[in-house]
Amino acid sequence: MMASILLTLFRRTKKKYKRHTDDQASNNQVPKTGQEHGRTSCRAPVENMNRLRGECLRMMEVLKEEMWRIYPVLLPQMELLDKECQTPELGQKTQMTYNWTQWLQTLYTMIMEENVPDMDLLQALREGGVITCQEHTMGMYVLYLIQRCCPMLPKLQFLKKLGKLI
């Protein structure tokens, strides 16, 4: 239940802050005098944008493949951490609505849906009261592990921060 709520919030955040990728200002430029008609000055940026789009798609596919490979390795570790969260005297789990395994599954699902998770989104969820401070720390740790195991994720996060991720 909590995982689906969190994924929905991530999707809304992505839609809300999605940037328009076409360069409308350069498409409306009038050709300068001395320039051939039929060739506009925005041709190079459009070609660069298409190349960037293709590169982003390639990087996303590589990230999905890396995540697909590392998920079976990380899952038993997260399950082990869930078991260690039990209190020794009562034998019950501590009160949390979101555990290690759920964080891994949520971040895995986001990556497979081509959403790039980052620390800023986790911080926004904590500040919005959606997750607790402890859950935020757990999510940051799981995201950090994924970043260490999937070298393409930090590159895509950097492009996202620059507003260049398509």
From Swiss-Prot:
Extra facts: The P/V/C gene has two overlapping open reading frames. One encodes the P/V/W proteins and the other the C protein.
Region of interest: Disordered: 17-42
Pfam families listed in its UniProt record: C_Hendra
Lineage per the UniProt record: Viruses, Riboviria, Orthornavirae, Negarnaviricota, Haploviricotina
Native source species: Hendra virus (isolate Horse/Autralia/Hendra/1994)
GO biological process per UniProt: symbiont-mediated suppression of host innate immune response
Function, as annotated: May counteract the cellular interferon antiviral system.
Leader sequence segment: none
Gene: P/V/C
Matches recorded under InterPro entries: C_Hendra
Keyword annotations of the record: Host-virus interaction, Inhibition of host innate immune response by virus, Interferon antiviral system evasion, Viral immunoevasion
Protein name (record): Protein C
